[in-house]
A protein has these predicted regions:
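Post-His helix in hydrolase/transferase enzymes
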Residues: 252-267
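Short alpha-helix in the alpha/beta-hydrolase fold that links the catalytic acid
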Residues: 93, 201, 210, 224-233
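An N-terminal hydrophobic leader/cap segment in hydrolases
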Residues: 9-55
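Short beta-strand/loop motif that positions the catalytic acidic residue
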Residues: 207-209, 214-220
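Membrane-embedded segments
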Residues: 57-134, 150, 154-155, 161
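Hydrolase active-site cap/lid region
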Residues: 154-210
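Alpha/beta-hydrolase fold nucleophile elbow
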Residues: 139-151
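Catalytic histidine neighborhood in serine/cysteine hydrolases
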Residues: 229-250
Length: 272
């Protein structure tokens, strides 16, 4: 192979690589936020929850589900879902978690579940803060709120919980940062300089002062288990974990998990 041909091949490969970088850079948010995917269990609600709409700072109405516990408790579970699918995909969790003496608010992000808007990191933070404001208008304060973050929702949870006295946090399949997650899925790309939405949970978790329960499947191939372990390691006490030998991204809601959840709820009651 002569020198000029070698140079041509190198230039062609470089051009293809740059095209890939350009494509991923311009499409990154459509790769990260996938509201159209419906890949989790659908289950009908077995509790008398109502559909509500929570208005964010852009006046976008976020379709949400609110369950008011008959005990009239102020304790409220606020749920932030992950990057894929509608809120209906999480009804099976609400059904299980309604066993506790708490209200439940499950919100959907902008552009998800039929909502208007375009998702961004700052946008999701705004949606989350709007949900907290909605609860506060119902005389439910931060100290009454347990925040549940699922996958991408864990990063929103950690951001919102910083230096705030929430009743507790539940993190399902948390990741250290979107940079680390992107490196795992796209190891051949310079994601550190490409990413618009970085979600730096590993830098923020030290600022969380609420009790934390972290659950993660050891065989998770979307968010590697080591990331959940790292977040647990960095978290302040009191903290507890449920690391289970499963190969799914989200953990199975079985008796073992619910037993650990029972212990966490006992912890946050006693922590007061």
């Amino acid at each position: 192979m002569n020198y000029s041909l070698t140079i041509k091949i190198i230039l062609i490969l470089l051009f293809i690589y740059l095209l890939i970088i350009f494509y991923v850079y311009t499409k990154q948010r459509s790769l990260l936020y996938v509201p159209q995917i419906d890949n989790y269990d659908d289950e009908l609600l077995i509790i008398p929850a109502e559909k509500v709409f929570i208005e964010n700072s852009l006046n976008i109405k976020l379709r949400s589900i609110f369950y008011k516990h008959p005990s009239n408790t102020k304790t409220t579970l606020l749920m932030f879902h992950g990057n894929a699918g509608p809120i209906e995909n999480r009804f099976y969790k609400i059904n299980k978690l309604s066993k506790y003496d708490q209200n439940i608010l499950l919100i959907s992000w902008r552009s998800y579940s039929g909502n208007d808007g375009e998702p961004t990191e700052d946008g999701l933070y705004d949606d989350a803060r709007s949900a907290i404001k909605w609860l506060e208008e119902k005389n439910i304060s931060k100290k009454d709120i347990i925040i549940y973050g699922e996958s991408l929702g864990t990063a929103v949870t950690i951001e919102i919980a910083q230096n705030n006295n929430f009743k507790g946090l539940i993190l399902e399949a948390p990741f250290t940062s979107m940079i680390d997650a992107a490196k795992f899925h796209y190891p051949y790309l310079p994601v550190s300089i490409m990413l618009k939405d970085k979600y730096l949970s590993d830098k923020k978790i030290k600022n969380v002062i609420s009790p934390i329960f972290i659950m993660h499947a050891i065989g998770d191939d979307i968010v590697p288990f080591r990331m959940g372990e790292k977040i647990y390691e960095l978290a302040n006490s009191p903290k507890s974990s449920y690391f289970v030998d499963e190969n799914e991204h989200l953990v199975t809601y079985d008796e073992n998990l619910m037993n650990m959840m029972d212990e966490f709820y006992e912890t946050i009651i006693n922590y007061e």
